[in-house]
């Protein structure tokens, strides 16, 4: 990506240098103290991408196979899996081409590699934006199902869900094209960072409100059963743990990447910010890890989906 760092660009592989021997090293900074740089080998990128690819393909296959899963909620989960799938495909493709170029097994002109790099950048940016959008859509869907349970099926209908899905994909494609075209404009970066903060705030507010309602409901049941403390404490701790994992994974996997974008605007020449810029590959690896974790949080917890997944695996064997 042009603005995000030079480490992962395909053009750099045309004139490659030997990789670092140690994965964790101190990178010299001419204008300040030494920086801690985490080097992510291409093999690790490839492995993470393949794991995420397999996981999300299974989610899409399971939802497509089982007609009981053809509902708005599972369609949003399916689209999240497709977004994560595109993140994985783009990174696997880029890593594979880089490895082939470095090994001399693939001969390509700089112009061809530039075009391929642009296509991959559009894929990565579009899939990132759509992934964030579908995470927000899933949160809104769950919120409506809890607070407007009686009206849920009249509010969240299949036609509306399809329109939302189409709008998200169109917006993601347009956003990625604008980002690649105007990557050197500060406003574009600030809009992306603002979008991430908005999604984080939306998810935090909705899930915290859902947890509060669930705890209130549990207290009501406990009072009826005259066992208020044991049920309330256990349920509250379990709900808080689930919420912490959900929001924590989201923030830890996406936060460093958008911190990187923020610092490009705020302090592009500062030595400390320069140290953070050197770890861009680590931030990309965390996003791929998020694509691995998403199916575990949003898809595989469904008993119906797990059952269908077993059938899919049995058919494949």
From Swiss-Prot:
Pfam family for this entry, one: 7tm_1
Keyword hit for Phosphoprotein: no
Extracellular side: 1-37, 94-118, 184-191, 267-279
Compartment annotation: Cell membrane
Residue intervals on the Cytoplasmic side: 64-72, 141-163, 212-240, 301-317
Signal peptide: none
PROSITE patterns registered for this protein in UniProt: G_PROTEIN_RECEP_F1_1, G_PROTEIN_RECEP_F1_2
Subunit relationships: Interacts with MGRN1, but does not undergo MGRN1-mediated ubiquitination; this interaction competes with GNAS-binding and thus inhibits agonist-induced cAMP production. Interacts with OPN3; the interaction results in a decrease in MC1R-mediated cAMP signaling and ultimately a decrease in melanin production in melanocytes.
Similarity field: Belongs to the G-protein coupled receptor 1 family.
Function in brief: Receptor for MSH (alpha, beta and gamma) and ACTH. The activity of this receptor is mediated by G proteins which activate adenylate cyclase. Mediates melanogenesis, the production of eumelanin (black/brown) and phaeomelanin (red/yellow), via regulation of cAMP signaling in melanocytes.
UniProt protein name: Melanocyte-stimulating hormone receptor
Organism the protein comes from: Rangifer tarandus
